């Protein structure tokens, strides 16, 4: 990291403090500044997951949506929230800073949660209670009540997206990437970011879910509202310690300009004079920037340099071309993680319904089915510090490298664990249906004589997969991306989650349509005990294996850009 002298104190080049003055080394940044970000993540994720983990039951039992629609609405809500992280990352890189984007986004989420709290508290804004257990006698939410619901939900979604697109990058920017110590601290930050994310999730799926089930949803939404408000206060308390990256303009403009310039030059007819001029311009450019040279990868983009001869707006520097190459080479890795997140989406919805049919008592306490994620969360809380303080130091000694385990190796482990998770889920569903059949309860709503702890097995594997993949992706995109595109690139981690949820919502109707057209009953109908959820899980397992082989193809060919990423 280059520094400039500011009096007797060196300043961070390209960074400012919260007053828009020069950020100074020793006063701004470091682990203290990042600690505020970690505390904020606990509160922010608590507010988010407190509702998301139980939302499918809220829509089904209080808004009277069908099982299929409530599941679809939840996956769409989650997907939209994560996809909007791209917008937050783009705005942070292009026009604002991660500091400003977080404050705006958290305020938007706060407003959305207030609306949801008001609706849950006022019966006039809710559909009337069902007159009987028959679904036909239940009035599904509609009209202005539905509008109130979805405005609140998608304000929350917009706020979550902005937070996810800015907060991880804001924390990672606090470290000096020019030193081994700074890079190691940044790696530790990403591990503990996932740890703190899990801390918030633990409170959400235990304490807040219990409140929602026993005290009412107005209390659940109220806790989330207070939590996001506290996150804003904690974030502001750290303002004097942060160093905020100064935006350098739209990264999308750079990408579009390079791609367009390369396309125009490639498609235009080349005369001998054009070739001469191009070589002349390129030689002149190389004289100005002797330390930079075009690489041999994605050579089709090298033609963007020639675009300077005819189009002033399309003039590209070597650095811009190389930056776009880096982004394009990361996209296949991004694409290979979508399937894992599709598996995560399926288990986060159907596993809740499975657990609702099983015996959820531990001693004399009846565990809410929405609290099932407590199992992977607890495991992630144990695994994250173990990974950072035991596994990584050991790996550094063995590999003699700064990073120990590469980002791509870490992501690969996560993909393998997701395959195991889906196989376990299929076997557990077979066991659950066998118990239902033997007890004569296939068509009954009575609790099955089988403990819900069986469901915990698939959650443990998927939670481990999520830990390895999410932390690996966040650090991979941040360290490999050009500095002007880091927030946007880091947002790809959340965009992968979004596309996984969208793929999940698309797969269910497709599978039902295909199985129905084959003369069978739809695999995923309304009656869970008559479904073929086990076959659906096996299908997901097979697709995950194919996806992993696809990942290996790209991971083996990827060449790291950043210092400290190579093992």
UniProtKB/Swiss-Prot annotation:
Involved in abscisic acid transport. GO terms for molecular function: transmembrane transporter activity. Expressed in flowers and siliques. This is Protein NRT1/ PTR FAMILY 4.5. GO terms for cellular component: membrane. InterPro entries: MFS_trans_sf (IPR036259), POT_fam (IPR000109). It comes from the Eukaryota. The gene is NPF4.5. Belongs to the major facilitator superfamily. Proton-dependent oligopeptide transporter (POT/PTR) (TC 2.A.17) family. SUPFAM superfamilies: MFS general substrate transporter. Coiled coil: none annotated. It is found in: Membrane. Its main location: membrane.
